A protein has these predicted regions:
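Hydrophobic alpha-helical transmembrane segments
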Residues: 1-120, 311-320
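Hydrophobic alpha-helical membrane-insertion segments
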Residues: 30-46, 149-155, 222-241
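Secretory targeting signals
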Residues: 86-90, 94-97, 144-218, 230-233, ...
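Short alpha-helical transmembrane interface motifs in multi-pass membrane proteins
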Residues: 106-109, 185-190, 296-300
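Helix-loop-helix units of permease transmembrane domains in multi-pass membrane transporters
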Residues: 115-151
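Aromatic-rich transmembrane-lumenal/periplasmic boundary elements in polytopic membrane proteins
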Residues: 218-267
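Alpha-helical transmembrane segments of multi-pass membrane transporters/translocases
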Residues: 279-320
Length: 320
């Protein structure tokens, strides 16, 4: 009783000890998150940085390809072998990087469930609720632990990749700048969109598990909602634009229909990912940050931010 009375005296009573203990509890997820972070953007840019000097030297040696000396010929063959090996590593890293990003999305969901386990795991409710802390400490401590375990390593990985990008001489790959545009699109709009996508995933998952009460529902509902929201949103847009309700707003061209689907960017993490990939492929990654990443446009970014904040606020008031 005395401990509970002490907890009520402060808004964030014993926040730091509770937060550190929760991060320690989530140590397996933290280790996997760090591994996924290292294998994604930084590893990709590290291989690119190693490959750039090789491409530059091959470009310089190509000037003497018509009449090379024996030393130049041997150097050219050695560089070709090295480039072949590096390209094999790059392809393998792209596959591993994509799998790591998928794993990060999955572990973001798992970490949120484990951090807020008292909402769906009845076997630990009494133990968690008996701790001498108040509801604010419990909610924000759990949420801060999720951000530390999943979002912080992701953000640091993006920053490291941005630093490595500054040292990469991508002009040696092609004269049209296509490689440079693709790499900048991946390291810029796509990377930060993935970061915001994970934050929105945490918000939606937390809102749904706050009133589920069972582990099965807590696992199934966030996944179903993540798919259902963009599908229902897109179907509603198509129904309105096709004249079902008495008005034809746009022509029925496929390109127009796809272009009008951009609002699903703000509806869910899946919608954000779909429209980001579509934007990058439709312009060949050649464009501004807002062209490659719809989330950076105010008309989509602000609603996405409001939806995310609303989910966090709803979860807070439901849990508290």
């Amino acid at each position: 009783m005395t401990a509970q009375n002490s907890a009520n005296k402060s808004v964030f009573y014993k926040f730091l000890p509770y937060y550190l203990n929760k991060v320690k509890y989530l140590r397996p997820q933290l280790i996997m998150s760090i591994i996924f972070s290292v294998l994604s953007y930084p590893a990709f840019m590290l291989i690119i940085n190693i490959l750039c000097p090789v491409e530059r030297e091959l470009l310089e040696l190509s000037q003497y390809i018509s009449d090379p000396t024996p030393e130049q010929y041997e150097m050219n063959m050695a560089l070709l072998d090295k480039r072949s090996l590096l390209y094999s590593l790059l392809i393998a890293e792209i596959v591993i990087g994509v799998l790591s990003l998928v794993g990060r999305v999955i572990f973001t969901f798992v970490t949120t469930l484990r951090s807020f386990r008292c909402l769906h795991n009845k076997s630990v409710v009494d133990m968690d609720m008996s701790l001498p802390i108040n509801h604010n400490t419990r909610f924000f401590g759990d949420l801060a632990a999720v951000f530390t375990v999943n979002i912080l390593p992701h953000f640091i990985a993006i920053l490291l990749a941005q630093i490595l990008l500054q040292f990469a001489d991508l002009s040696a790959f092609d004269t049209q700048g296509e490689t440079q545009a693709i790499v900048h699109a991946i390291m810029g709009p796509m990377a930060f969109t993935g970061l915001f996508m994970c934050i929105m995933e945490i918000a939606i998952t937390l809102l749904l598990i706050s009133f589920c009460g069972r582990l099965a529902e807590a696992c199934i509902y966030p996944i179903l909602i993540n798919f259902a929201i963009p599908v229902i949103h897109l179907m509603t847009i198509n129904l309105v634009e096709s004249g079902v309700y008495g008005a034809v707003l746009y022509p029925s061209a496929i390109s127009t229909a796809v272009g009008s689907a951009y609002p699903i960017t703000a509806s869910s993490p899946l919608g954000m990912m779909i429209m980001t990939l579509y934007s990058m492929m439709s312009i060949g990654c050649k464009g501004s940050v807002s062209d490659c990443g719809p989330i950076f446009r105010p008309e989509f970014g602000i609603p996405a931010l409001l939806v995310t904040l609303a989910c966090f606020a709803g979860a807070y008031f439901l849990i508290i």
